């Protein structure tokens, strides 16, 4: 990964100019070739639920995907790494990845998702996401095996307070942004990393990658965010001037429910994380006030920095 490539597809449909490729387009050609080429490595090796300890002691959980030989042994070569930090639990990404590996199932599912159109309904904002599926959206949301089998490592991390990670969900806030920088630094220092990190993701994971780039961590060399946003009212709640109140409650409910799904493997192994449970019970339905704030706060940053005061101001 070289240079800084930013492809922004915003929810409003307005394209944001990408940063020019300093190689004159050579990097884009190389990226496409790597993503679309036949697999260079026959297998993918996965390290499940690898702990990453943040500076405040909170432990986040990550799955690490690396190219492997026919026996399933990961290659020894240090590789560029693609990072995705998600609030939707790695378990969902694993499920999507597994479905895509079933012969004869992936294509019909992708076609169905791409055909969904919620225009004119309270769920209008979802349409942009479903239409991105046909262009490789699921690989960006979950695991991109094409990249892994062609010489990249991929790290998928449960954001603080979601999935199997400890802590309280700090939606796109200062602590979560600091976590992103620390995860990037941790990734760059692993033996399987060549020290260069890129980020990709859709929607929430697109926004946190843009935020991470703004912090300019030394190891972050590129981001590819699909469907990020900044103004919740214009991008989600009132897209095009039509008020749609269905998405935000559904989204908050989804994340708040998914964060209670436990790590079954750790339970079976007698290694259940009791702090994880304590953190969930302490904040069972976080960010309900932010749902109301979405109608008045100018930007996502306002809600993240001033979650309980933006309406009053």
Language model regions located:
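A fold-wide structural signal in alpha/beta-hydrolase
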Residues: 58, 81-84, 148-155
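Alpha/beta-hydrolase active-site loop
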Residues: 135-143, 149, 171-191
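Conserved alpha/beta-hydrolase
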Residues: 144-164
């Amino acid at each position: 990964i070289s240079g800084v490539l930013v492809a922004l597809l915003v929810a409003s449909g307005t394209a944001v100019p990408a940063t020019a490729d300093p190689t004159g387009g050579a990097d884009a050609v190389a990226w496409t070739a790597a993503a679309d080429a036949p697999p260079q490595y026959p297998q993918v090796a996965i390290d499940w639920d690898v702990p990453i300890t943040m500076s405040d002691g909170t432990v986040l959980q990550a799955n690490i995907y690396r190219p492997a030989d026919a026996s399933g042994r990961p290659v020894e070569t240090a590789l560029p790494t693609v990072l995705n930090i998600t609030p939707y639990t790695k378990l969902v990404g694993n499920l999507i990845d597994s479905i895509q590996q079933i012969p004869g199932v992936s294509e019909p599912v992708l076609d169905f998702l791409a055909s969904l159109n919620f225009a004119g309904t309270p769920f209008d904002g979802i349409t942009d996401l479903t239409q991105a599926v046909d262009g490789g959206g699921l690989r960006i949301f979950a695991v991109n095996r094409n990249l892994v089998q062609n010489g990249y490592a991929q790290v998928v991390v449960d954001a603080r307070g979601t999935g199997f990670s400890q802590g309280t969900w700090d939606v796109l806030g200062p602590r979560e942004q600091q976590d992103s920088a620390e995860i990037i630094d941790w990734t760059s220092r692993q033996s399987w990393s060549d020290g260069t990190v890129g980020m990709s993701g859709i929607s929430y994971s697109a926004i946190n990658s843009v935020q991470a780039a703004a912090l300019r961590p030394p190891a972050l060399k590129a981001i590819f965010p699909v469907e990020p946003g900044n103004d919740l009212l214009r991008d989600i709640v009132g897209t095009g001037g039509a008020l749609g109140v269905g998405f935000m409650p559904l989204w908050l409910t989804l994340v708040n429910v998914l964060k209670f799904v436990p790590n079954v493997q750790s339970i079976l192994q007698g290694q259940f994380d009791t702090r994880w449970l304590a953190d969930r019970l302490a904040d069972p339905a976080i960010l309900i006030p932010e749902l109301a704030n979405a109608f008045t706060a100018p930007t996502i940053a306002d809600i993240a920095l001033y979650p309980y005061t933006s309406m009053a101001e």
